[in-house]
Amino acid sequence: MSRFLRFTVFPLFALCFFHVQAQRSLPSIAEYTKGMVLHEGYFDFFYDESGGRILLPVRPDQMDVEFLYVHSLPAGLGSNDIGLDRGQLGGNRVVKFVRAGNKLLLEEQNYSYRAESENPAERQSVEEAFAKSVLWGFSCLAGEEGGFLIDLTPFLLRDAHGVAARLKEAGEGDYRISEERSAIYPARCKAFPRNTEFEATVTFEGEPSGKFVPTVVPSPELITLRMHHSFIQLPDEGFRMRPYDPRSGYFYIAFKDYASPFTEPLEKHYIICHRLEKKNPLAERSEPVKPIVYYLDPGVPEPMRSALKEGASWWNEAFEALGFIDAFRVEDLPEGADPMDVRYNLIQWVHRSTRGWSYGGSVVDPRTGEIIKGHVSLGSLRIRQDFLLAEGLLAPYGDTSRLEEAREMALARLRQLAAHEVGHTLGLAHNFAASCDGRASVMDYPHPYVLLDEEGKMRTDKAYDSGLGAWDMRAIAYGYAPLPEGKEEERLQEILQETLSTGLHYISDEGARPSGSMHPCAHLWDNGSDAVVELERLLVLREKALQKFGLDNLPPGRPVAELERIFVPVYAMHRYQVEAVAKWIGGVEYTYAVKGDGQQLPRPLPLADQKRAADALLKTLGLSVLGMPHGWLELFPPPPPAYQRDREFFRAWSGDLFDPQAAQLALIDHTLGLMLDPQRLSRMQQLAVYRDDVWDIEDYLKYLFKSIFSSKPDSKEDREVAMLVQKRFVVHLLHLAASDEVNPQLAAVIEDLLLRRVSYRTQSGKHWAPEDNPAFADFRGVPFVGDPNFRAHETWILRQIFLYLKDPAFFRQDPSVPLPPGSPIGCGDSR
């Protein structure tokens, strides 16, 4: 035998010998677990009650076999601001147990990099090129017939969900796991045929440093949550992956396929969806092999329960249109069923200390995009916020017949919300352009569409739509329509072309959420195909609501100070439509066009439309919009004991008394912040370099200057509002000039306009440009003749310019005073 073979074969022989010897030296699994209760399922497990341990026997046929590992929070923190909600899902990880001597390693596979090839060597080359992750190593306690027994307990008691990191990120303090206060939660450790579920009570110990933990935890230095761990059998073969198309409206999985021809993209995308097949593929209408069934959390009370069931059930219409019979159902969760059991798609009712977002998450097979379990989390306080909106609009306590109308408006929103979040768990992304097509999708964020009847009374019967929209039907067709064998791609393209022929708009989050985004149709919480027309209509409704605002908006027996809580969303009723209109300025129409599909390529919005938008926004900076309702002082007293001004109120400089100027300033900053968004202005400046049919940035800013500084107030309040707008306009411009977020030429234009356009009235009445004003030298200037209040105002403006010239960094921080949280209406963004 050669020297090389001797040195190679002997270590291999020794390794195998010691492995066998190691197993022989271990007690048998039966011996080690004597007296323990065996739970049989996908993974069997023993619960050692005396030691508080979970022991997992891993059979030989389970070694090197992939399965899905998911962690979640069945019992959460209860703070919307921090997150960590009840039912929150963690990531989806494909893992397997790998034998390593006398240890088992739980190894996460890397499906982000693959070789979709029949050649094993090609697949192996990619697998070896990129790292895996060993999540845990387990010492073997016992063994027999090639299987091993491991103690899963330390793995289950770790911070799998990243709780400590989330608390630190939220500024709530440094926390660590307290081992002596953590234990297995045996009541929720169960084994099922396709999945095995484990749960643990985990306590975090630390020093709280934020303001949110103390509001939801009895002893803030000790946070006790429950963490759930699911070992899930991966679906069998047969799921037909559907290629993702940016026009389809779906979420997707993505991976790099190194077996792709070099003439094709390296990265592949496939949609996320449930498996759905007809029992009889040849029949025009057929029952499914397995329907998609969602189950309601038994903790949802009436009448919310019925509303959720009705709204979620709307989706069956879309599947019926594809030839399925009862393919989608909503049922009550069976008694005794575990909500975290992967066999149940769940609609869960989540309580928090403050209102917050609802969301639809899913357990997804990362290999294929198949949804294994849909999990909807609905915030229970949403409906209270919707009812509060109705109280502000309808003043139902002066006419109790309107009280039922207010309740129905809140329930109508809940139906729509249930459909929206279930839509996410079917694989659908947001469509924030659907409002341009007459409320064409439940995947949009709807603002209540309130009308005035012939008598001038508010009507809310059409506040929220009922049923799916046209876009929803088309989107479900792409993800779930049966596809003819061998012609799958051809049929999918036909579906897309049919959708395009309807003229429906589709723009998702990245084109709608940023305040500086540009699409004239893609907005959150808006209505109408013409944003400007809708803003004007909404302001009429708002004025009507403010004119009659008073004690009839407040329930009997409530402190009058709580009326301000109802007033806030009425006064700021137009905030989201303002954002929609602002996107017309520097706006660009575009689609998710694919070569050859004939869709609109990017084009700037016509200049006339941009000016129409600017005029509409400038009107919101006038007294007609910012003025206070008559008798406001009597309506908003300071809060009594046990009540307080919280973040749902406007900020105040005047202590506990309502501060009208602070409320006005917040709305002024909201509008100006959108009109002067750095992305918006940079886009305008750049487009004007290459096109003559757009609004030049200097002309735009001059237009704003002229409108804002040429107002002629005719009352004390009007004058105060005008001066406040001018102050905030200058401060916002100085912030932009000092910002690193705008291109240099835009900063130069802003700086030049400020220095040349802000005037100072001298004794002779002549207006001097700032660079000629003596005040620039020593801030003494010529004595001012006129209103001392206005003199102080102009002096303040000049002072800001001096501060900027001395130290631009002083203005780099965003100067905006935020409005009280708006989203979510009824779902954290607080614009």
Regions found by a protein language model. Give the residues of each.
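Sec-exported extracytoplasmic/periplasmic mature domains
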Residues: 313-324, 423-424, 428, 448, ...
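Auxiliary tRNA-acceptor-end handling modules of aminoacyl-tRNA synthetases
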Residues: 23-300, 318, 332-385, 390-406, ...
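Conserved catalytic/binding loops enriched for acidic/polar residues
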Residues: 437-831
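The catalytic-center signature of Zn2+-dependent metalloproteases
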Residues: 332-351, 412-468
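Zn2+-dependent metallopeptidase catalytic core
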Residues: 63-64, 301-327
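Extended catalytic-interface subdomain
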Residues: 370-374, 378, 418, 422-426, ...
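Soluble non-cytosolic domains of exported or imported proteins
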Residues: 88, 298, 302-310, 408-413, ...
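Bacterial Sec-dependent N-terminal signal peptides
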Residues: 1-23
